[in-house]
């Protein structure tokens, strides 16, 4: 071989891998598909197993929903941000709640001090919820609420406000995250032990089936699993394992699979590795369709469809050279779109530093609008299909996820896998491996371990006025002083009674809310009966 050819054949690395550590071939050909029928014949969009998308015409009929996640400080402050985003072309709302709201504590709880309105909006009562959606008719928008341990309470608050607006409950559209299992393995905002928490999940399924037919009763979330450090394969596997557990719990509670499965939805991370991420979404869709058909004998085609929201990867954003995050977010969003998402949130450039400013949030929204209107990727359906690389990686991820699912089944299911610490340990190992790769410069991160700036330029960031917490606490105190305490206490007593039976909890929660019971009071009523989850130490 000539010196020129030898130089041309020399590669940059000895081994090429995806960001998750999966090997990447030098060249993908038809032989890379290895006779895999699904890879060689990916089928058509809108047809089982939905590798190419869940709808026949995908974005040629309707673009994905641009649903920017927002919420901070008080309900009034967040309402201003929602109305601003809607005025700029956003089509759906996505609500971020503060930590006290997420774990069932009122804003005046001692442990809430310093956290009120910090990472999301503070919601204590129906009055706060009414302010949050003031001037926004709830039967004209779809709303996603990222809430889990207190999902039943926040859903009932939303319904109570809709009733006050005179909206038809049959027209309410949206999603409540309601995915408690991932809290035990990745995020930590749990309250109750696993058993009672799963009971609340299935109560929501059953109640919404009749009361809110257009509502998505759960968003089974891989996003936080990936943010905790998992690989793409683990994100698919552990998310679908959670999904299997929820379906089985609903069946055990007496629900028929096709009565609730069409309202299941999913939430995935859109990370940096473009090809791996596109393939990940396709693999998840195909695998879920097969699980629902083969394992649960679902007959309704909608029960087989993995509908998903995506959010760009917060953990990939860097505090160093934060303007670079605009590019990261743009590429991640492109992966989600090419992977066939139904809705998308694009992170803001400043989120490694603080909650997003209004200007940063607008750039994030404009990123989606540019992808939709200027790149042409939405003009044809599943343009990546047939790529040897994409189809091969799709099958590789599906096979890896199946292996994890088999292991979880052997452990007795996802609940047992969580309680034994298996899932947490697997995620921790992957997180360690990734961080080590960054620190040894095997994994390059621009601005962090390569192409660093000698002096970092500061950008404007959002700060929350501490006075807003005092104002929130004062409003809560005023609510308690003016409500009919006897009626409130009576509704909480009814909730306690129901919680000791198998009766559905949501009618009692709604009644308590309409009588001005607070998020903390309702949560404490259930704590008194169910107890609190004690985390296992996983080494």
Label every model-predicted segment.
Residues 124, 147-150, 162-164, 187-208, ...:
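Phosphate/diphosphate-binding loops
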Residues 2-271, 276, 295, 302-309, ...:
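Catalytic alpha/beta active-site cores
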Residues 154, 243, 266-292, 308-334, ...:
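Extended, hydrophobic alpha-helical segments in both membrane/secreted and soluble proteins
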Residues 87, 91, 134-138, 160-168, ...:
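Generic secondary-structure signature for well-ordered alpha-helical cores
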Residues 114-118, 143, 182-192, 225-230, ...:
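Short beta-alpha connecting loops at secondary-structure transitions
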Residues 7-35, 44-51, 99, 358, ...:
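Flexible, glycine-rich loop/tail regions that form catalytic "lids" or insertion modules at the edges
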Residues 256-260, 298-312, 320-349, 356-381, ...:
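Flexible glycine/proline-rich, aromatic-decorated loop/lid segments
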Residues 62, 108-111, 181-184, 219-222, ...:
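Short acidic (Asp/Glu) and glycine-rich catalytic loops that position anionic groups and cofactors
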């Amino acid at each position: 071989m000539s010196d020129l050819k030898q130089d041309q054949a020399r590669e940059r690395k000895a081994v090429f891998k995806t960001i998750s550590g999966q090997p990447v071939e030098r060249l993908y050909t038809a032989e890379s598909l290895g006779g895999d029928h699904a890879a060689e014949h990916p089928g058509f969009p809108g047809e089982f197993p939905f590798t190419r998308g869940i709808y026949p015409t995908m974005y040629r009929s309707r673009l994905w929903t641009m649903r920017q996640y927002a919420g901070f400080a008080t309900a009034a402050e967040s309402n201003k941000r929602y109305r601003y985003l809607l005025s700029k072309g956003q089509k759906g709302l996505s609500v971020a709640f503060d930590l006290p709201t997420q774990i069932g504590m009122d804003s005046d709880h001692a442990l809430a001090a310093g956290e009120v309105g910090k990472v999301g909006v503070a919601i204590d009562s129906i009055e706060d919820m009414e302010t949050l959606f003031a001037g926004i008719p709830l039967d004209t928008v779809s709303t996603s609420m990222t809430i889990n341990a207190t999902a039943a309470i926040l859903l009932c608050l939303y319904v109570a406000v809709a009733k006050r607006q005179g909206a038809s409950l049959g027209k309410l559209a949206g999603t409540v995250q309601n995915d408690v299992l991932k809290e035990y393995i990745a995020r930590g905002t749990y309250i109750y032990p696993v058993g009672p928490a799963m009971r609340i999940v299935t109560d929501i399924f059953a109640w919404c089936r009749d009361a809110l037919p257009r509502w998505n009763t759960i968003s089974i979330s891989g996003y936080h699993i990936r943010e905790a450090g998992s690989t793409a394969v683990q994100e698919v596997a552990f998310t679908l394992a959670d999904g299997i557990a929820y379906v089985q719990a609903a069946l055990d509670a007496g629900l028929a699979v096709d009565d609730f499965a069409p309202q299941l939805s999913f939430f995935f991370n859109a990370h940096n590795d473009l090809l791996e991420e596109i393939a990940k979404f396709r693999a998840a869709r195909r695998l879920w369709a097969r699980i629902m058909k083969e394992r649960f004998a679902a007959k309704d085609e909608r029960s087989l469809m993995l509908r998903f929201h995506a959010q760009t990867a917060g953990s990939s954003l860097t505090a160093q050279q934060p303007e670079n995050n605009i590019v990261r977010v743009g590429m991640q969003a492109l992966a989600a779109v090419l992977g066939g998402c139904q809705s998308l949130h694009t992170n803001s450039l400043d989120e490694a530093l603080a909650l997003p400013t209004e200007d940063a949030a607008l750039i994030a929204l404009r990123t989606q609008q540019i992808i939709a209107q200027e790149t042409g990727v939405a003009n044809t359906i599943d343009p990546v299909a047939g790529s040897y690389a994409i189809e091969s990686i799709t099958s590789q991820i599906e096979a890896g996820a199946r292996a994890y699912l088999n292991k979880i089944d052997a452990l007795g299911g996802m609940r047992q896998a969580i309680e034994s610490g298996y899932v947490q340990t697997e995620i921790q190992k992957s997180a360690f491996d990734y961080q080590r790769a960054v620190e040894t410069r095997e994994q390059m991160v621009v601005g962090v371990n390569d192409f660093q700036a000698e002096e970092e330029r500061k950008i404007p960031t959002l700060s929350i006025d501490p006075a807003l917490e005092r104002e929130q606490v004062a409003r809560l105190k005023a609510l308690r002083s003016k409500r009919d305490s006897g009626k409130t206490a009576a509704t909480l007593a009814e909730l306690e009674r129901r919680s000791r039976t198998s009766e559905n909890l949501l009618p009692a929660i709604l009644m308590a809310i309409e009588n001005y019971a607070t998020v903390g009071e309702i949560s404490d009523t259930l704590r008194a009966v169910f107890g609190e989850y004690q985390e296992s130490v996983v080494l």
